[in-house]
């Protein structure tokens, strides 16, 4: 029994270190400290909540992230909440940049579809590309902002 506890001790210590690193990452994210996030990220690799650390790190520097970095994150954490949240953030940035090709390519993979601003960008793309009349939907989304 004592041997089992002794063997498990390093695993518990590693888990505790990962927990501490994640808490530090959460604080760094709230402060906007992207350098600290990047420094802490290797310490959470393999942790059950690694996706959160990776999300915070990439989200903090999203405006300078490359499309390749985005794709690597989206592939590595496919199917997770963090994957779709970062996709939401990326779609917003692509819309702000008026990167309609990138936006249109990524939009079908967006599962939650819970962001009104992303929906407005999607309607703009739809209108420009097909000439569809989207005025009623845009108006509905515009007025819904007051209720949010």
Q: What residue spans do the PLM features occupy?
A:
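Sec-dependent N-terminal signal peptides
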Residues: 1-6
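N-terminal signal peptide c-region/cleavage motif recognized by signal peptidases
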Residues: 8-10
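Alpha-helical solenoid repeat scaffolds
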Residues: 12-148
């Amino acid at each position: 029994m004592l041997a089992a506890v002794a063997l498990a001790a390093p695993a518990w210590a590693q888990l505790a270190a990962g927990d501490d690193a994640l808490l530090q990452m959460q604080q760094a994210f709230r402060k906007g400290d992207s350098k600290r996030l990047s420094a802490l990220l290797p310490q959470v690799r393999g942790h059950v909540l690694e996706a959160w650390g990776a999300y915070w790190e990439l989200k903090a520097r999203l405006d300078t992230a490359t499309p390749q970095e985005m794709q690597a994150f989206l592939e590595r954490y496919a199917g997770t909440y963090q994957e779709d949240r970062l996709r939401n953030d990326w779609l917003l940035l692509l819309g702000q940049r008026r990167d309609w090709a990138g936006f249109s390519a990524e939009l079908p993979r967006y599962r939650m579809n819970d962001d009104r601003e992303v929906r407005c960008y999607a309607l703009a793309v739809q209108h420009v590309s097909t000439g569809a009349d989207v005025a009623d939907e845009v108006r509905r989304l515009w007025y819904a902002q007051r209720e949010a």
